[in-house]
Amino acid sequence: MNQTAQLSSTQTYDNPIPGREFILSLFSSLKKHLNREQIADALSLNSPEEKEALRRRLRAMERDGQLSFQRRGYQLIDPESLVSGTISIHPDGFGFVTYSDTEKDLFLPKNQLKHVFDGDLVQVLIEPDKNAKRAYNNLIKVLERNTTQIVGVLQREGKSYFLLPDDTKVSQHIEVDESKLCDARVGQYVTAKITSYPNFRQDTQVEIIEVLGDPSDAGIESKLALHRHGISGLWNKILLEKASTHGTQVAEADKASRVDYRKLPFVTIDGADARDFDDAVYCEQTEAGDWRLLVAIADVSHYVLPNDALDIEAQQRATSIYLPDQVVPMLPESLSNGLCSLNPNEDRLAMVCKMSINAKGLVTQSEFSEGLIQSHARLTYNQANALVSKPSSKLGKAVLESNPAIAPHVKNLHSLFKVLLKQRNQRGAIEFETRELALKLNKHKNIANISPVKRNDAHRMIEEFMLCANVATAQFLETNKIPSLFRVHAGPQQKKLTALRAFLSEKGLTLGGGDKPSSHHYNDLLKKVSHRTDAKVIQTLLLRSQSQAEYSPKNQGHFGLAYDAYAHFTSPIRRYPDLLTHRAIRAKIRSTKKPMSLQGVLRHLKLNTLASKAMSKNAYPYSVDDVEVLSKHCSEQSRLADTVSREVESALMCKYMQPFIGETFQAAIAGMNSSGFFVALENTGAEGLVHITSLPGEDFSFDASKQKIANKKVCYEIGDSVTVLLKSVDLRGRKMHFTVAVSTH
């Protein structure tokens, strides 16, 4: 032992033991796992005092990342082989660690994740094997916990209480002390706070902080999903009061310096159940045959100022969440459904995008203004469609009688839509045919019936107008070099493209464009296969080859829509990026472009970090770095909203299908992997797995390149029609399992 190590030991402990360097050299020489007793024997430490000092030293070395403790004992860590990343845990127990934008995620087996929760920041040791053919990944430690609360069902076994997590990604045994039950009854859903995280020496310890209800309670599915992801559907009383201070009508002072568009017959066209109206449209044709389109969007930015309390909360939420039985709004209802909603026959503040569109459907000029509008009518999609497509129908006549003045303007909108539709086709926007289902709930918030959503020209008309405004917005942001958020959609990744081309080759088909196909190439193939019996299969795989759209501070274009630049402008009531865009436009209009720091707001995104006063309406307080942080946050929140919505729909569907266990259904194969194939029932759209081991016959195998599951006699492909029997419903996992009853093969 060297003198430095000896001196360190003497200073640290009353009972000197070998220093860290000596212990590290011991591991280097033995090159294996050692438990504490083996280390003590190797160092000739025999007294209880020496062994206690060794225990402390080993724990300190573990804490400082020099040693790792596993069930086999301690092991030496090579710092150069350590990486840190976020763990994503699969419901089956294994997980993947994302640690690099360029490197593949690291696989960790189930037996290493007994003390880890989904989303934890972990440290992993990458160790090549003796043959250096592949690396083994060993979890070293959890650096930062992501989970602080767990939702589950309170259970009892003998005299002990425990929590059965609602999230199947949580596999740990979770103990609940009898003194920490918070009046919860066995069988009830609860939210529990983690008081002690698991390790090799103890299980997870929690205390119940809220009783959510019984499994039979109306709306329990939404309540569980929101709590599972830490989302509050409630509003702070102070924020509600702040939102209500703006009143219910636009103040006269706020109308000053606005462009007055109230005489123009703007109209809102939305779904029958819509409660917030954030867009209104008007168009007219010029004598030259061109068009003038005005898209007016609710001016949320006038009422929600950068860095004020409402803004901080809206920023946290980043989006409204739409569930089958409720909406979790980004803004308080006094704003979202009240003062900011473009209700008919009421003065409303709006950001207006005015566009000139030529006879070819190209936007030749656009400008933005702070406007004052009044919607002249609130129409549903079906009402608007009846006016232009079926004016002599009962609905068409009823709309015409109730508001005859609006009819010619709606017909103008439809005429412009047809021009824009031709341009859309020429531009090459990808047209996938997708099936959307609407869940109608009863008073108990269970599914009463399921019906397909029927889109008509009115849906597509409003969509095209919003696209025009969003593109004009993106061009405005790019031209003026304003740090803001673009909505980007990259082309297909090479890995997905290679797999797609292999599949198409098996079908005797090719996708043009080489390594960088365009949306035109996708559309050409879709048209080519439209009359084939396997058209649905091919469309499904073309769709799955696409990347996911996201927010970015850099314009990268939108592949699917075939736009060079695209941003979100049209929904500031329900999307924070749109609110940010409105602030950018206002800042340019008012010539206040100086970037300011957001201080700790973006770092913490919590109300209790609010330390400074709200900024003026003129301010645009976002630097490039701020926008970078916001782009990631808004993308994550958008994906989270989709996840929560899917989970609630899956839970409701499982509950709806449970009484039909043992019955047969006609279905189509929607996807497949090595576990089996997924089916979607034709009548309800309910989805579930047919496991490969349950297929009638023997020796079935999955061919990833051909997207087939087959044996010598039978072959299953995506799009095939099969008759399936509902075998079981897993309410906790929100999954259904089927078996093949009668195959059409």
Segments the model singles out, each with a brief description of its role:
Residues 1-294, 301-347, 378, 385, ...:
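Charge-lined substrate channels and their catalytic hotspots, especially those that engage the 3′ end
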